[in-house]
């Protein structure tokens, strides 16, 4: 492949959550459905609903899904997403942070993508509401992009449409993409694996806060 020519295909790192599903709709809008794939990682997460949602959405939208087992990470690190530990703040970041997870996801995605002739990688990381996760920062993504390009001598382009959006703005983007109700109804965010959300974990609270803020804003606009 001519490295100066951008492939007209894209792959989305996909968990079945609000952020990655919004990114999927963004990719579909830009690249067309037939040119988009998703990749999902089984890393030993404490519940299966995340994987089930991702599989259902991919099938429902007619998107090719590849599932990669990276559960070996459980053998070398521990946190509240892969154990039954109580979710809490642990110093400057919550104990739901999985060391190396996004670096691992991007590496495996890049390896797969190169084999498929895909250069554009979408990931739903966000620096605005990132809960203190260091691997959700823009500086990390840019660094990883350079590293992967050098490591594989390939012109990857890592896209982060949500990087500087609040959760309210992420809901607004889903609405602009015509996917608001789909994302609201079909995606899973809860750390505890509760269908429809537990309404108490940090992830649920952030999602609901953003949703309520966006709905209030929309309602205000209609009343003007």
From Swiss-Prot:
SUPFAM superfamilies named among the record's database cross-references: Adenine nucleotide alpha hydrolases-like
EC number assigned by the record: 6.3.4.20
Matches recorded under NCBIfam families: 7-cyano-7-deazaguanine synthase QueC (TIGR00364)
Natural source organism: Haemophilus ducreyi (strain 35000HP / ATCC 700724)
Signal peptide limits: none
Role summary: Catalyzes the ATP-dependent conversion of 7-carboxy-7-deazaguanine (CDG) to 7-cyano-7-deazaguanine (preQ(0)).
Cofactor field: Zn(2+)
PANTHER family: 7-CYANO-7-DEAZAGUANINE SYNTHASE
Binding site for Zn(2+): 190, 198, 201, 204
GO biological process, one term: queuosine biosynthetic process
CDD domains per record: QueC-like
Pfam families given in the database record: QueC
MF-aspect GO terms: ATP binding; ligase activity, forming carbon-nitrogen bonds; zinc ion binding
Name of this protein: 7-cyano-7-deazaguanine synthase
Organism placement in taxonomy: Bacteria, Pseudomonadati, Pseudomonadota, Gammaproteobacteria, Pasteurellales
Pathways per UniProt: Purine metabolism; 7-cyano-7-deazaguanine biosynthesis
InterPro entries: QueC, Rossmann-like_a/b/a_fold
Reactions that this protein is recorded to catalyse: 7-carboxy-7-deazaguanine + NH4(+) + ATP = 7-cyano-7-deazaguanine + ADP + phosphate + H2O + H(+)
Family: Belongs to the QueC family.
């Amino acid at each position: 492949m001519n490295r100066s020519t951008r492939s007209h295909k894209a792959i989305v790192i996909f968990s079945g959550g609000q952020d990655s599903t919004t990114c999927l709709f963004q990719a579909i809008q830009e690249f067309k459905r037939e040119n988009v794939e998703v990749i999902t990682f089984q890393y030993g997460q404490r519940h299966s609903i995340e994987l089930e949602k991702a599989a259902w959405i991919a099938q429902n939208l007619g998107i090719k899904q590849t599932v990669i087992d990276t559960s070996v990470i459980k053998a070398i690190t521990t946190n509240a997403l892969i154990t039954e530990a109580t979710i809490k703040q642990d110093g400057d970041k919550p104990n739901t942070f999985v060391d190396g997870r996004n670096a691992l996801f991007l590496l495996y995605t890049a390896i797969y993508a190169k084999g498929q002739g895909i250069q554009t990688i979408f990931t739903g990381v966000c620096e605005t509401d990132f809960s203190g996760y260091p691997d959700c920062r823009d500086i990390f993504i840019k660094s990883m992009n350079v590293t992967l390009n050098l490591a594989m001598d390939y012109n990857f382009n890592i896209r982060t449409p949500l990087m500087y959006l609040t959760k309210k703005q992420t809901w607004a983007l889903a609405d602009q993409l015509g996917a608001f109700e789909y994302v609201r109804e079909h995606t899973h965010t809860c750390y505890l694996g509760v269908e429809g959300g537990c309404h108490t974990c940090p992830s649920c609270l952030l999602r609901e806060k953003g949703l309520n803020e966006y709905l209030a804003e929309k309602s205000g606009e209609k009343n003007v």
